Structures are given as structure tokens and as C-alpha cells.
């Protein structure tokens, strides 16, 4: 939070907080199922943190980034979610100021039948 000082004279200092304005969040870009490649998918799942995120999402319909962060820094988790989105594993949508994530299991099963289930069974 930034606080600004106004000087109306040398002895009088007034502090004020500027009005808060939150612009609407941009929608995330997700690859179409036919653009999902096996290389990107396997790369995204090669990191233990991302694999744990996918494992958690497999057990629920949807979860926020905060529910999945495991106490890790926000910037680190933002990177992991971007890699998962770019690989086509996760769909992220905005709900107010929260990002809700869901596993794109149906899309992945159409593109690579049984792959996600096999990976999660072994993890």
C-alpha cells in the first residue's frame, strides 16, 4: 500500500491513500487439445511440485492457487501454473481475484488415451 503526503504548508502535512482500482483480470490462454504435445506434457510433469499439483487436482473438481501452493512463494507457484497451462494440463479461470484451477483430464484422455491415468497411478 502506498501512502502519499500532501504539503499544504510547511507545518501541515496530510496523508492520504489513493483510491483502489482493480482492473478486470485477463482471461488465461489455453492450448486447444490438438496443440498439446507429448514433449510439453512430460516436461510439465517432470517437476515434483507440478506433479503434486496435478495429483491434487485429480482428486477434486477445482482448487484455487492458494489451496495448492504448499507454502511456496507466489512467484514460484505462478511459474508452475503457467507451465501446466501451457502444456495443456490445467485450465485456469478467474473468479473475482482468485484463480481457480481444474485438470483437463477429458481433453488429455482424448489426445493421449490412458496416459494421465498411468502417470498418476505410478506417482
Predicted region positions:
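Amphipathic alpha-helical dimerization/coiled-coil segments
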Residues: 2-37, 55, 59, 104-123
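Short hydrophobic/aromatic-rich motifs at helix boundaries and adjacent loops
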Residues: 25-26, 36-37, 52-53, 76-79, ...
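Helix-centric, low-specificity signal for extended rod-like, repetitive segments
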Residues: 4, 13, 43, 48, ...
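N-terminal helix-turn-helix DNA-binding core of bacterial DNA-binding proteins
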Residues: 39-73, 95, 99-107
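Compositionally biased, intrinsically disordered low-complexity segments enriched
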Residues: 24, 81-82, 101
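Intrinsically disordered, low-complexity regions enriched for glutamine and histidine
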Residues: 20, 77-78, 97
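A general structural signal for short secondary-structure boundary/capping elements
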Residues: 87-91, 99-103, 117
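Canonical helix-turn-helix DNA-binding module
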Residues: 66-92
Amino acid at each position: 500500500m502506498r501512502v502519499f503526503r500532501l504539503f499544504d504548508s510547511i507545518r501541515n502535512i496530510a496523508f492520504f491513500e489513493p483510491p483502489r482500482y482493480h482492473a478486470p483480470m485477463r482471461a488465461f490462454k489455453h492450448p486447444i487439445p490438438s496443440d498439446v504435445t507429448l514433449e510439453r506434457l512430460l516436461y510439465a510433469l517432470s517437476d515434483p511440485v507440478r506433479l503434486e499439483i496435478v495429483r491434487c487436482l485429480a482428486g477434486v473438481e477445482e482448487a484455487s492457487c492458494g489451496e495448492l501452493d504448499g507454502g511456496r512463494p507466489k512467484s514460484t507457484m505462478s511459474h508452475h501454473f503457467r507451465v501446466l497451462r501451457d502444456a495443456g494440463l490445467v485450465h485456469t479461470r478467474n473468479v473475482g481475484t482468485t484463480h481457480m484451477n481444474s485438470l483437463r483430464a477429458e481433453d488429455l484422455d482424448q489426445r493421449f488415451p490412458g496416459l494421465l491415468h498411468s502417470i498418476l497411478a505410478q506417482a
